[in-house]
Amino acid sequence: MLTRRQIILGSGLALCAGLSGFGSAVAAASAPRVVAIDWAAAEAMLSFGIVPVGLSDTSFYRQRMAAPVLPETVVDVGPFWEINLEALAALKPDFVIATDYNLVMTPRIADVARVALVPSITTPNVERYQLAIEILNRVANLCGVSPSVPSSVVEAAERRFAKARETVSKHKYAVGVMLPDIGGREMTMYGEGTLPDAVLRKLALSNVWSGPVNGTGMARVGLDQLVESADAAFLVVDIPSQRLQTERSLQQNTMWKLLRPVRDGRVAWLNQFHPFGGVPSAAHLADLIASALENMA
């Protein structure tokens, strides 16, 4: 069982001042040794120019998270649901950044290192993009970073939202952000409460899926539930390891091929996007959506 001492950081963490923008350089000596289990927290660190010494599932992170780029020096400590405690201990981190969900999956993390909690994406009653900002600010506070640094990251993201909003302003399509199952028969739709929905709102675009969702804002639906989305654009989340099989399954699915957006060529794949990311992921998604819709014109 976790104690307050285990989950709250002690004093004396080195300050990481003098940073600005996405991924600014910071002297290694001035940064704490941090292992990030939560990817949104890792993304936040990198946007401050702080490189974690360890991260959960580095290979998959690089497939899903475009920028800031994760350096090759970062040690993989295993998947978030089964952290390699020996690898974690060997890194001798000042602390580990995780969510309460991570601790449920691997509670013994706290036996190895001090743990600092960041908000989970399932935090209730918080708008999803605002939650991303809260994660950014929390990570900055943990790392001793000046509040002006996360503010500059948010400002940079807002500029990208504005540019993307201008690009898509001439498009009248509702947008469906979706993840197909590998068999191509069902879609996970990202509805209210998800990062894709928050970004669509930032871009003044309607979300195709306004139906019921689960606690994380997603809904698993059959293709027949997308028939009425005639005037829409479908943006498909790319999982690299599944892409070929998924495309093959969709191409062989008659219902998919009969959907109006598919027939009219209004389908694009979203590369290197992780729907559980933070502010940098939101800005990246805005760029992807703008590019996809512009190419459909």
Label every PLM stretch briefly:
Residues R33, L131-E134, S229-A297:
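Structured C-terminal subdomain patch of bacterial secreted/periplasmic proteins
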Residues S56, G193-G217:
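His/Asp/Glu-enriched short active-site or ligand-binding loop at hydrolase and phosphoryl-transfer sites
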